[in-house]
A protein has these predicted regions:
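N-terminal lobe/hinge region of extracytoplasmic solute-binding protein
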Residues: 46-96, 126, 130, 194-198
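Boundary of Sec targeting at the N-terminus
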Residues: 40-41
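Extracytoplasmic/periplasmic ligand-capture domains
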Residues: 77-80, 93, 105-135, 148, ...
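N-terminal signal peptide c-region/cleavage motif recognized by signal peptidases
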Residues: 34-35
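Surface-exposed binding/hinge segments that line
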Residues: 22, 93, 101-103, 137-182
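Bacterial N-terminal signal peptides that target proteins for export
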Residues: 16-26
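Long beta-strand-rich cores associated with HINT superfamily self-processing modules
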Residues: 366, 516-541
Length: 541
């Protein structure tokens, strides 16, 4: 039986820190960790963040997408390194610069027994960008599609208004549902009535804010997963998740804090799985307003001119930050310094990009050159529950900027508040610490979301909370995204990434290292996209 699985990423709320598990109690529980799990047993996975909906098209949010990937398939899947692999389409072929043919997998059935056909693809691609009330649409992945045509039950031809060589990458984010649920409500998915997929599991129960219960799909085209039942249990607090593993309450834990890595490595009955992820931690700046509210003089009055609009000031910020200290000392190896929007080795990332090394003298010189020889005051807003050590990183960066002459104050808050106030239509802040996971596994994903000029209709600038705009960058990115020849597209993306860093459109700081823990007897292939998927947890001797 062919084995080919999938996943994908995007923003999500993380830990709320309402629960605290003392380190000594975690150690005591680890000492009593039970024997290896067997495949015949159900599997319980502790996740960090709750999915908000069981509707796979409602919100392009990581917890939602991860839940969907258990129940639904996509035309194209991604492997652990985000390479494209066959999903419900066995192959995809460009017929011209603007036309793609997707050959669909035959013999596939939804978990209610109905056949999967081209009609389901047409309905899904029509529904995904147009779900009422969606706080984060999938429209960016379906931009430019002008028609989707069935040629028999097992062939789909997709036409775009301009060349889109990234269409297969984009379609790896869009779940396929039965055509009859084209107009189904979110409630119909919550109850399970419409949550019918072709994926390795079927949805038994979904409880918003708490998780989901799944049952194995024994007829899955890639072979039945090893677990008869799966519980996805949301435990927001890092320590509480690890303690649940130690107590034998769960079998798999995501988002293990780096501070506990050494402890866990010495514990019998626990296995760790880690990889450098593509999740970028970065600083974003308000460059749209002439006066910005949180850049002030010594008396706290907003400056007459927004200093963050000057690229020299943004470059000074970059030179003020000691990325090595953040990654190694503060996060204990839980991150790696970032010099671009994706780690080296991903498609479209320039080898010329290197993380800035801290140079306080050069930072002060740039501030003086920008007419700010005595610096200014700045408030940094960021999350305190989005990724491990996020509040510590925020506080540390504020301290580093202060040493360079930008007297900075950290203002941590829940991620939900940061997102609601730091983006459209409010744009309340001046400088923000955010993170971003590259959905498509290549450089256009962060560039079109974080750096491109905001254009909702075109699906560009969805994460551009500073409203940076550079028409030269936009033209270069658009050229890259419509260039069919891969090496030419790679070169254009590299140039676009270099331009974004040179102009300090954002300031890349860190790439997170993702860490999972399992009970002995289980294996998990760590993924660059950070997804935790039960179908990839396997028994091992």
């Amino acid at each position: 039986m062919e084995k080919a699985y999938w996943p994908n990423p995007t923003p999500e709320n993380r830990r709320d820190r309402e629960t605290y598990m003392p380190r000594h109690l975690i150690l005591a529980l680890l000492a009593a960790l039970a024997a290896p799990a067997a495949a015949a047993q159900p599997l319980t996975v502790a996740t960090a963040s709750p999915p908000t909906s069981a509707d796979p098209h409602f919100y392009n949010l990581m917890p939602n997408n991860a839940l969907a990937a258990h129940v639904f398939d996509r035309l194209v899947h991604q492997d652990a390194r985000q390479n494209l692999v066959p999903g419900l389409a066995t192959r995809w072929t460009p017929l011209s610069d603007t036309t793609w043919e997707f050959t669909l997998r035959e013999g596939v059935r939804f978990t209610d027994g109905t056949r999967f056909t081209a009609a389901d693809v047409i309905a899904s691609l029509a529904r995904a960008p147009d779900v009422t009330g969606s706080p984060g649409s999938f429209a960016q992945f379906l931009r430019g599609i002008t028609s989707v045509e069935a040629r028999g039950d097992h062939t789909v031809v997709i036409t775009t208004g301009s060349p889109n060589p990234l269409l297969p990458n984009d379609l790896s984010l869009v779940s396929i549902i039965p055509a009859r649920f084209r107009n189904a409500s979110g409630e119909a998915f919550r109850t399970g009535e419409a949550a019918i997929g072709t994926g390795p599991f079927r949805l038994v129960r979904f409880t918003p804010g708490q998780g989901a219960t799944l049952a194995r799909n024994p007829e899955h085209w890639a072979g039945a997963p090893p677990w008869g039942a799966v519980t996805l249990r949301v435990i927001p607090d890092d320590g509480a998740r690890v303690a649940a593993l130690a107590a034998g309450d769960v079998d798999v834990v995501e988002g293990v804090p780096s501070a506990l890595r050494g402890v866990l490595e010495r514990q019998p009955g626990v296995r760790l799985w880690s990889t450098a992820s593509n999740r970028l931690v970065f600083l974003s700046f308000d460059v749209a307003r002439e006066v910005t509210p949180f850049a002030t003089d010594a008396a706290g009055r907003p400056l007459a001119t927004n200093p963050l609009r000057d690229a020299r000031v943004r470059r000074a910020v970059s030179l003020a930050v000691d990325r090595e200290a953040l990654a190694e000392r503060l996060m204990g190896g839980g991150a790696r310094p970032a010099g671009g929007v994706l780690p080296p080795g991903f498609f479209g990332v320039s080898d010329a990009l290197r993380p800035d090394r801290q140079d306080l003298g050069a930072a002060r010189a740039l501030l003086a050159e920008a007419g700010l020889p005595t610096g200014f005051r700045l408030t940094l807003h960021g999350s305190n529950n989005r990724f491990p050590d996020d509040e510590k990183v925020l506080q540390a960066v504020a301290g580093m900027l202060t040493r360079a002459g930008i007297a900075s104050r950290a203002e941590p808050m829940p991620y939900s508040v940061l997102v609601s106030q730091g983006g459209p239509p409010v744009y309340a802040y001046s400088a923000m610490l955010f993170s971003f996971g590259a959905n498509t596994g290549e450089a256009s994903s962060p560039l079109r979301s974080l750096v491109a000029t905001v254009d909702r209709a075109a699906g560009l600038g969805a994460g551009n909370r500073g409203r940076y705009s550079n028409l030269g960058f936009d033209a270069l990115l658009q050229h890259a995204m419509t260039t069919v020849e891969p090496e030419a597209r790679r070169a254009l993306l590299e140039r676009a990434g270099e331009l974004a860093v040179r102009d300090a459109a954002i300031v890349p700081l860190l790439f997170l290292v993702s860490l999972w823990a399992t009970r002995d007897g289980l294996a998990y292939e760590p993924r660059a996209d950070e997804w935790t998927l039960a179908q990839f947890v396997t028994p091992r001797p």
